[in-house]
Amino acid sequence: MFDSTLNPLWQRYILAVQEEVKPALGCTEPISLALAAAVAAAELEGPVERVEAWVSPNLMKNGLGVTVPGTGMVGLPIAAALGALGGNANAGLEVLKDATAQAIADAKALLAAGKVSVKIQEPCNEILFSRAKVWNGEKWACVTIVGGHTNIVHIETHNSVVFTQQACVAEGEQESPLTVLSRTTLAEILKFVNEVPFAAIRFILDSAKLNCALSQEGLSGKWGLHIGATLEKQCERGLLAKDLSSSIVIRTSAASDARMGGATLPAMSNSGSGNQGITATMPVVVVAEHFGADDERLARALMLSHLSAIYIHNQLPRLSALCAATTAAMGAAAGMAWLVDGRYETISMAISSMIGDVSGMICDGASNSCAMKVSTSASAAWKAVLMALDDTAVTGNEGIVAHDVEQSIANLCALASHSMQQTDRQIIEIMASKAR
């Protein structure tokens, strides 16, 4: 996987990125439920006749308004049904990649027959929780995912417990590669990016390949709010400048348009989110192309962006009231700043300005409008880089921004982890009242 002679800390960084930067087809909250249903169906004796599911309030929030790839339908019920009838139980976040037209038709028929139910799990102390129970007559199989979008903790059928994660942990499971991030700094991450052998991080170029393809699909104008395609038209009409800033926003938002609109192309995700992966990737790719960067420079910039985004998000709940496109864009700001001048001071100033700019953006569930927030975050990231290049940034005398970038990040994450919990409850209450 990598050179065993590498610095052990660098090995952990690479493992963390490989753990958190993965292909994902469809918005990852509905996909998490689809995966639970697919794994349950694989354990069931006989074809699935009925699906019951329970999810955490946060997962419900992120599943109410997003299109499930290939179906033209929004919401968790179609995700659960298609996972059960057409999902690949071994494909992780790409669980629906092999779903056939017949499976989609069967899933819609199951919904129409009233054989699929999705409810909020009560009580639920988990931020990310999905459980799917599939039935064939009196026989059933049930799968529970907790904590991470693919983190299966329990598999049970009508006659036995097939798997429970607690048993594995008791036998001595290895420490998560993300643990190292709680003991590191942005300065150490930058040193890694500057010095690690290119061969060890070449794999990160796959994020550019996948997300550029998604962006190109989004520019067709068929998906979501077609923000990218619309802004591109306005450039042609002379209402928007054809410049680097516009290109960053257009190509980044186009990928999110396709992602949230249900395109059947995978995104390279970051921290369990396709939009975070898009936001950490596309601005860096556009700037790299502008400067004619070769594959090695692009890989280093992408590694800095993705690892910085993971580093920041690791201090947050997996799902929260804070729109995490903003924190992914902080990673993008780091990657873009590195491409332009590479100095730690520029990178840290850009991140500080981002925290002073878009830190209040809420997450009100996954939907087509996520592409609006992605475009805003990408634009803010480039603005922060331009300011930093002129030695200008939001200072430690202002708001939640501190004199030290590490403390600024900690302040933002404390806000999201604690004070914004009530915000999250209010958002979920508002969305639930609309659904009734």
Swiss-Prot record:
Gene Ontology terms describing biological process: L-cysteine catabolic process to pyruvate
Any one GO MF annotation of this record: L-cysteine desulfhydrase activity
Domain of life: Bacteria
Membrane-spanning parts: none
One Pfam family from the record: SDH_alpha
Similarity annotation: Belongs to the UPF0597 family.
Protein name: UPF0597 protein YhaM
Source organism per UniProt: Shigella boydii serotype 4 (strain Sb227)
